[in-house]
Amino acid sequence: MDTRRGLLASAAMAAMLAWAGGAAAQGTPPDSDQAAVETPQDVEALPDPVPVAAAPTISDAIAGGRLLLEVRARYESVDQKKTAVLTENGEAYTVRTRLGWETAEWNGLRGLIEFEDVRQVGPEHYAVNVPGALTPPLNGADKAKYPIINDPEVTELNRLQLTWTPNAALAFTAGRQRILIDDQRFVGNVGWRQDEQTFDAVRADLAFGRFKATYAYVDHVNRILGEMKDWDSDSHLLNATWSPAEAFRLQGFVYALDFGNSAANTSITSGLKASGKTWVGLFQVAYNATYAVQSDYRHATPAYDLDYWGGDVTGTFDIYSVRASYESLEGNGVRGFSTPLATTHAFQGWSDAFVMPLGGNKSFVDGIDDLNLSLNVKPRFRRTYFFNADILVRYHDFDAERTGADLGREWDVQAQAAITSKLSVALKYADFERAASVPPGAATPPPSRTKVWFTFEYKL
């Protein structure tokens, strides 16, 4: 205890002496030599305050955006059964160019503008028209002797949109935009054709946990035939998905379509879809099952009710996938279940034989039952300028849903690969063979045809 007290006393005395020395130093002005000793010259000055960064401006967002550039060159040939009018095969050499700019984000806003141009290269040996239309081809009456290849020359504003993302769960998009819903069975951009389908619309997307939803009001449909065949629209699209597990996803949808200049395609379609995937040993198994009902809307057509059933199962092992699929689109003898806004090229065969006058979408007055089998192989073969190869073979068997009549069959084959990270090449083939005979009272199926495509595509 005495030792601790002694130490405390010594510390206190030292502190007092230090204080006294400091006071004396303050009371007696030092001479210059003393000042030099007592004011060290190596004391660092305080750093200047860090300037506050200026808030980003709209100009910064525009300048910090990214260039959009796509070029797709394609050769397409069509050999269709000849008639008194259709006497020649069709060929088209076309080049599609898209050029645009997407801004960086500014206060949750992001803008995009894109132009699209489609040009023919060489002779115009093809017709542009709605299949089955009785009017002359849009590219000239003299082209009626050729099969239809719907890639008209066009230069247009493809997209002009503003997207606002107030938080991670919400996004709103207004303007001319691309709308792809699910597998594009009911709403898509028809991306296979050179002039894609876009929508003048206001759209809201919600993503909250396992729940996602999309709503869009569509004012105008910019279709694949240029402005001559666009649709004025007063349509509503609603799709909602709940995903409790990877093996099960439930989706509900309502598509209320009202087209001022296409009453035949005005309809309301609602339905449910279940899908999912899981592992069974070394195999991944995926499935889809869809039911929808379609009826007249706003009294634009006589009353009707038509059903759609669709389902598929895909098994994947290593680089191989096998899929079995069945679709049934009901027909009542006057009209069939239709999907006016779908990317229809992906369904009922790549030959597009069942694209009918009803708006140019795939349909058939007696309905279509389509049983198809697919084999997909993704070879591991890789070279510097050849990789990501993909080979797909598919077989379709078509019957009329209402009568059961044989409509025909089709083989589809596609091989594609990447040449660089931005350049790809694809070769595609479709052959539809119509049934040899039609039972009495059954609708006549479309004529036989064979199509070949060779495509180079560059995407920045």
How does the language model describe each region?
Residues R74-V78, V118-G122, I179-I181, V218-N222, ...:
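Structural signature of outer-membrane beta-barrel domains
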Residues G360-D369, S374-T420, V425-Y429, E433-A435:
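Flexible, acidic glycine-rich loops studded with aromatic residues
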Residues T28-S32, A36-V37, A168-F172, F186, ...:
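Signature for the C-terminal beta-barrel architecture of outer-membrane proteins
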Residues E76-V95, E105-L160, P166-A168, I179-R193, ...:
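Surface-exposed loop and membrane-interface regions of Gram-negative outer-membrane beta-barrel proteins
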Residues T339-D366:
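Flexible internal linker/loop segments at domain or repeat junctions
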Residues L373, P447-L460:
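Outer-membrane beta-barrel "beta-signal"
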Residues D2-W106, D318-S321, S325-Y326, L460:
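N-terminal periplasmic/intermembrane-space "pro-region" immediately following the signal or transit peptide
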Residues T57-S59, K81-N89, W101, P147-N150, ...:
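Outer-membrane beta-barrel proteins
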